[in-house]
């Protein structure tokens, strides 16, 4: 609304509103494999024309505009949005596209260098808690057992690595009454790395198999856990805990995300925080 008011006063600039990928997807089930998605198939052959056409006729780009253009050119609406954002003067988006280590906009921040970005952070009182969540990581023991059963018929190697992870978690579980602070989990981290390497090899050879969704879900959680493990310092606490459903988890909890946030903010020239609560 603010940019529409500015436009009405003569402001000329391109403004993109980024909507979550799940809300942009036009398929019944989100699967970005070109074999399963007609919008992904041949996307890169058509997307440049779609972006160029949009830039010629619009100044404020919303979800509805991207969906309409995606249908017209049969391209992925989310990727169309991101490609258009590369030409924008203003980008409106959720915190995670700047701060989340998993989904930040790599086309803008991957180089890690300071650029001429100005960050306007609204609802700033929520940022610390959101950042704690983004830079923490959780793994649940029962997930390793469940995925092991699914993948064992297709890869005994991956199943064996999952079992090693499960055994370490079982040892942690036996030491834990309700929750337990962990000083050193290097043996578990190495087991996760071995699982990750085996999973990479397996995924290169096996494109489709029953239980792939659950497998990928755990695989991505493990990758995030290892990425956060590399960030461990005095601002983190590692602990294990029994959950309400009697499952058992291990968590890397980012108590103070200040350094992680500053690392992101340093990629821009200036930041202004807004909050009606603070």
Residue positions per predicted region:
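Hydrophobic packing residues within well-ordered alpha-helices of enzyme cores
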Residues: 2-6, 127, 261
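A substrate-engagement module of RecA-like helicase motors
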Residues: 1-91, 99, 149, 160, ...
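Short glycine-/polar-rich loops that comprise or flank the Walker A/P-loop
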Residues: 11-14, 114-117, 268-269
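Signature of the SF2 helicase/ATPase Hel1-core->accessory helical subdomain module
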Residues: 71-196, 273-278
């Amino acid at each position: 609304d603010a940019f529409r008011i500015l436009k009405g006063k003569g402001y000329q600039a391109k403004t993109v509103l980024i909507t979550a990928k799940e809300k942009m997807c036009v398929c019944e089930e989100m699967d970005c494999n070109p074999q399963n998605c007609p919008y992904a198939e041949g996307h890169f052959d058509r997307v440049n024309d779609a972006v160029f056409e949009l830039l010629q006729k619009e100044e404020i780009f919303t979800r509805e505009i991207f969906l309409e253009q995606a249908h017209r050119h049969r391209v992925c609406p989310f990727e169309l949005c991101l490609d258009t954002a590369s030409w924008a003067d203003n980008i409106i988006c959720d915190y995670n596209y700047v701060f989340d280590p998993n989904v930040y906009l790599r086309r803008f921040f991957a180089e890690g260098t300071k650029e001429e970005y100005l960050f306007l952070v609204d609802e700033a009182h929520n940022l610390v808690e959101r950042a704690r969540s983004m830079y923490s990581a959780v793994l649940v023991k029962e997930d390793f057992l469940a995925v092991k059963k699914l993948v064992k018929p297709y890869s005994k190697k991956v199943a064996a690595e999952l079992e090693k992870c499960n055994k370490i978690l079982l040892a942690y579980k036996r030491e834990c009454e309700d929750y337990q602070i962990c000083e050193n989990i290097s043996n578990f981290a190495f087991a996760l790395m071995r699982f990750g390497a085996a999973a990479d090899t397996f995924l290169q050879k096996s494109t489709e198999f029953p239980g792939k969704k659950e497998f990928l879900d755990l695989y991505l959680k493990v990758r995030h856990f290892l990425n956060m493990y590399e960030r461990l310092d005095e601002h983190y606490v590692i602990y294990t805990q029994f959950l309400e459903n009697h499952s058992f988890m291990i968590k890397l909890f980012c108590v103070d995300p200040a350094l992680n946030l500053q690392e992101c903010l340093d990629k821009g020239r200036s930041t202004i925080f807004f909050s009606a609560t603070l």
